[in-house]
Amino acid sequence: SEYRQKRTVGEEVTTDMRHVDESHFLTTTHEAYKPIDPSEYRQKRTVGEEVTTDMRHVDESHFLTTTHEAYKPIDPSEYRQKRTVGEEVTTDMRHVDESHFLTTTHEAYKPIDPSEYRQKRTVGEEVTTDMRHVDESHFLTTTHEAYKPIDPSEYRQKRTVGEEVTTNMRHVDESHFLTTTHEAYKPIDPSEYRQKRTVGEEVTTDMRHVDESHFLTTTHEAYKPIDPSEYRQKRTVGEEVTTDMRHVDESHFLTTTHEAYKPIDPSEYRQKRTVGEEVTTDMRHVDESH
C-alpha cells in the first residue's frame, strides 16, 4: 500500500491514467514544452503605434551595427578641420613641406649641419689635435694601458734578497702536480693504517674481526643468532598450558578481527518484525513494480 499514491478528496478514479498525456515526458516542467502559441511571438504595440511599424527594419543601415548612429553615412564636411578666426586660407597647404613625414617631430630629421660634428676647442688648444688618433694602439682597447706591448721581463718572478739562483728548478719535484696541496698526495706510510693501541691492550686484538657475525651489520647485536625461545609468547600467571593451540581455530587467519568473519547465523538475515505485523509480510516483495 506504500506504493499507492495518496489521492486527495474527490480525485477521480481515472488518475491512474494521468501519464498518458503525450507531452508528459518532454520535460520535467510540463509547461515548458507545451505547444507554443504563435501569437506569443507578436510584439506588443504601445497605444498609438502605427500599423506600419512592421516595416521599421527596411532601413538599409539597420544591420550595419547595433548602434544606429555609428554607421550612418558620413558627411565629408566632418573631415574638414575647423579654422580659427583669422587663419589664412593657405593653411590647406601646410603639409607640402618635404620633411613632414620624416617624423612626428619635425626638428628631429631636419638637414644636419656638418659643422655640428666639429668638436669645440678650448682656448689655446693646438691645431694638431686632429692627429691625436694616429697612435697605433688607440683602437686596441678603450683603456690604452691595458693592451700596450707587454715587457717579457714582467713574467719573471721577483726574487727576495738572498734567494738562490737555482730556484728555477723548484718544480722538478715529482709530486708537484699531484695536487695544489703538496702534502695531500705524498706517499702514504703503511704504518699509518695501524691502529694505535692503548697501554695494556693485548696483542691479540688484531684478531677481533674473526667473529663470523662481524660484517652482518654495523650493530653487532642486531644479527646475532636468534634464540627460538624468544618467539614464544610470555604467559601471564594462571594461563593454561593449552594456550599454544589457540591458533588452531580455522577462522584465525580470515582477518585480524576474529569476530568479523565468524560463521554467520542465517537467522541474522531474518528481519525483525514489529509487534502485530502480519505473517503475510514475507510476501511484500511480490509487487511487480517493486
UniProtKB/Swiss-Prot annotation:
Sequence repeats lie at residues 1-38, 39-76, 77-114, 115-152, 153-190, 191-228, 229-266, 267-290. It is found in: Cytoplasm, Cytoskeleton. Keywords: Cytoplasm, Cytoskeleton, Microtubule, Repeat. Its main location: cytoplasm. It comes from the Eukaryota. Transmembrane segments: none annotated. GO terms for cellular component: cytoplasm; microtubule. Residues 251-290 are annotated as: Disordered. Residues 259-290 have a biased composition (Basic and acidic residues). Made of tandem repeats of a 38 amino acid segment. This is Microtubule-associated protein P320. It comes from Trypanosoma brucei brucei. The lineage of its organism: Eukaryota, Discoba, Euglenozoa, Kinetoplastea, Metakinetoplastina.
